Amino acid sequence: MLKGIHKYLLMCFGTVLFTVQANAARIMSNNPIKEDWQCKVVDGEWSCKRAKKPKSVFDKKLTKTEKEKALADDLAWVKKPSYFVGGYYSNDNQFTKALCESKKTDLSYEKSEFDNYGTLIASGNVQVLQCDQELYGNNAIINLNSNNSAIRSLVMAGDVIVKQPSTGIVIRTTELDADMNNGTYSTGEAYFRLAREMPKTRIYDKEHFSGYLRGYAKTFKKESSGDIVLSDGYITSGDPYDNAWKITGNNIDIDTNTHMAYVKNGYFEIQDIPVMYIPYFSHPIDDRRRSGFLYPGFLQNANSGIGISVPYYFNLAPNYDLMLQSVIWSQRGIIENGTFRYMTKYFQGQFEGSLVPYDFKEGKMRSSFTLSTTGQYENINTNFKYEYVSDQNYYNDFSAGNVNLVTKTLLDREFDLTYTNDYVDSGLTVLDYGVVNPLLTVDNTPYAKLPEVKLNLTSDGYTPDYLTLSAQTLNTFFYKTAGPANTNPGAPQGTNVNAFRAYESPKIAFNFNKTWGYLKPSLELPIRYYKLNNKPTDIIKFKNSNVTSVLPIFNIDAGAYFDKDYTNENGTYTSTLHPRLFYTYIPYQDQTNIPLFDTSLQNEQYMQMFQVNRFTGYDRINNANQLTYAIEASTTNQDNGTTLASAKIGQMAYFADRKVNLCQGNSACPNPGLMDPFSTDTFSPIMSSFEFQVMKNIYLSAQVNYRVKQQNVDYQVYQLSYKDENENIFNVSYNNIANNWNSLTQQQIAEGAKPQPQETITLSTVLNITDHWGIAALWNYNFQQKQIANIFAGLQYNAKSWAVRALWQKTAYTNQDPNNPTLLGPLVNTYMFEFELKGLGGIGNTSDISSRLQQINGYQVGEWGNGI
């Protein structure tokens, strides 16, 4: 129908219309439509010349530069050099609430005539405005209804612009045929733009990405369903001056219900040069989830070779979906990965599974899966997780450098059910562990809790504010299956005694608070009962099968506040001085007749001075007659609440030796002095914690312990961080811990081993070198092992409408010895590549690259893209 419309309109608008005896006759005239003139007075006389008409993007005589300028004007592109993309699309429109509510159509023009059939022929700046549709053109033939109150259909020609304000659609064409009753229209040759939602990250904000797809088609048709059909066209996300890439197609269908675009028989072009044939391609036009193939991934793992992944996403329902991914490894064969996610009113969870039907190198089938779910109904919460892996090297071979997986030695298997309100905290836990490496000895395998039941009560709300009565109850069945023994010659063996433990702890606490300080005395009475199931095969044996322990804990926490406000040219500040005393008394009790089920020592840090027990868990309660004295100072900006500086320093004075240790059973401790060489010291280290905003964007933190008696620093952790408004990041962290009690294994405890030192340094950065180029890197070195533990380097080129990223990583995949977590394994190389077309998403393992960068302190997900 569109063929010949333009010629017909030229004939119509080249005539003067008049009526002769009910017959309409059209008489040709050279110039019935007035041209625009620009006039001014010169020497008392009018001087006029024809106004310069804007160039048409369809003019074949235009140069490339002129055509880009014309297209930018037609699509309402506003130049703004300060933006990375050089500008933005304007969405100015004539939408009014009154127009929508009236459901009427506004029609305006400069000149018009009617024929005898109710057809209006309008010319000169024709505008047709509806609630969510705007039509502009030079000329129009408009068919009205019987009483001339509404438009049935129209044909426009000339410089035609179609706008849909609600969606941001803008179409520039030469011909338009529209049915106003059902909202359909078709055009001839057309340029257009389509809006889409942008992620809230810096590289996709208004300044860094336009947020629009634009394109061209020989014909553009909007159907009654709202779907859009294009023929012989292309789409891209570049601005009108950016033609870096295009996806062309003989047919491009845009489904406005599913918000998907489908391209058939097309090409992927770079700078107008076809580089890939695309028989079929689909992509979203917004951020909603839908079924379809996702972008392939490319990676390399030294254990498995080169991998190519092809994912397919099933949007099964609004509340559950499925992702299937086939990965072809050059050295291993095919691995099938699947992730099923669901969400209901009360539950949500996911199942992740992987299957290698036949591993070329291993000659067998391999697999893994993880099932996790959480639930909530009013005050009831549930949590379930179960992990499985077929063999100890599975994660190493197929994880492609995922640090969280390749260092796993245990598999979580847990179920939790809790009920909480203002007065009750209760729960049921069933916890067990799977072993990744079968060489993990039985003493280093944690106990299962089959099950554990807790009930904690508090009087808050029933007693005065200064008084709190509480009770803690924890009943646990501990169980451990047999495993390989410690094969070191002469080494003591860990016990696998099973037991039931009941822990009851009533407590009374007072809280006397004033604006200038506080006093908080408390008295607690932990009662422990153990029923041990000794076995004849146990190397470590316990004399009594029934053990009861009762220990009172008396504590006083007191402090004062001294505040001072001051103002300078930078704002108003508050400086606070907070001296604090913390006294604890617990009588000594020999606890070597109690096994270690969930107990270990903690590293000495500043906040640990304000805990009554230096052991974790419930199997050891230290004896104490000690006083902590500390002072804290801080400066806070009252205008924004930020802390400019914070300093804390304190020490503990011991009035009795610390006699309780981790010795257990008849094995005693081979070398108790090695495990805790400071148990007879009169004073603890001087412990400190500092945080400073050195200057704008630069922060320094430090934790330092200094032992006065030994005259050495045995605990030091430093971190220097920089992050500016352009997301440039630089971090340096260093830690040196002379006695790392946190790393002691149960086997080392049984051997009475000395805590191992730890010394590492980490450098990391995300640096935007220019508007286009960026680098990211991390380097972690272990001084004790004298080797790199983790290193990666990435490079990004970020263009206006596309981005490319590459990353190399070298990581210690597994512990050389699962019974010694401080010992690093061999380093393995991993390579990743990602190519992203902004507006369409990424090609490559965006999640893998993102997971690497999340190891950098201060990195925000999406800064290097995360797909769209």
From Swiss-Prot:
Keywords: Cell outer membrane, Membrane, Signal. The keyword Signal applies. It comes from the Bacteria. Residues 1-24 form the signal peptide. It is found in: Cell outer membrane. InterPro entries: LipoPS_assembly_LptD, LptD, LptD_C, OstA-like_N. GO terms for biological process: Gram-negative-bacterium-type cell outer membrane assembly; lipopolysaccharide transport. Together with LptE, is involved in the assembly of lipopolysaccharide (LPS) at the surface of the outer membrane. Belongs to the LptD family. Component of the lipopolysaccharide transport and assembly complex. Interacts with LptE and LptA. This is LPS-assembly protein LptD.
